[in-house]
């Protein structure tokens, strides 16, 4: 009788651990889909923004080209890792584009450009929140896969650690800020 209770308890624990891993894997997949929705929105906004600003920004072709090429890589990426890398390039390119746009007063006055810029900023914020939620769920899944004794269930049923969504190295760099009160002399 005691043996039967122990066997039932072990089987129940295995079922619980397996179901928890499946649930976490599904949460990771769902979190990625949430990021995907926002990335699709960003991909839809980029051509409109490029079209709106390219007439003004004759000397910034490299920046515009970088954004367009990164978008093309992201859309055609064969796997999630390649897509994450391409999306990081888009984020970097859009950051440069927004910074360069500050040098063009005509763009600041163009209502269509301002609306697109606002939509893109909102989308970037939503992507950041979705990435954070995704990475939180990945942390939970990866922790479960690595801790004993759940790691035994994970390895026997083929559960793999998920990859974090990492930002581009440029996003992680500490910005240089000059707070000196002196003005540069020519």
Predicted regions and their residues:
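A helix-centric hydrophobic-segment signal that preferentially recognizes long
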Residues: 1-186
């Amino acid at each position: 009788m005691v043996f039967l209770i122990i066997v039932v308890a072990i089987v129940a624990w295995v079922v619980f651990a397996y179901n928890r891993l499946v649930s976490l894997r599904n949460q990771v997949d769902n979190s990625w889909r949430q990021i995907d929705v926002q990335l699709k929105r960003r991909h839809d906004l980029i051509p409109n923004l490029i079209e709106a600003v390219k007439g003004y920004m004759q000397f910034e072709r490299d920046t515009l080209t970088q954004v367009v090429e990164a978008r093309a890589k992201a859309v055609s990426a064969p796997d999630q890792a390649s897509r994450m890398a391409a999306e990081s390039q888009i984020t970097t390119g859009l950051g440069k584009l927004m910074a360069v746009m500050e040098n063009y007063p005509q763009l600041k006055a163009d209502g269509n450009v301002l609306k697109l810029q606002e939509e893109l900023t909102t989308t970037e914020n939503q992507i950041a929140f979705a990435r954070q939620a995704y990475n939180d769920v990945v942390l939970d899944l990866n922790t479960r896969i690595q801790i004993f004794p759940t790691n035994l269930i994970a390895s026997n049923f083929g559960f793999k650690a998920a990859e974090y969504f990492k930002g581009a190295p440029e996003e992680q760099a500490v910005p240089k800020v000059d707070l000196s009160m002196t003005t540069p002399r020519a």
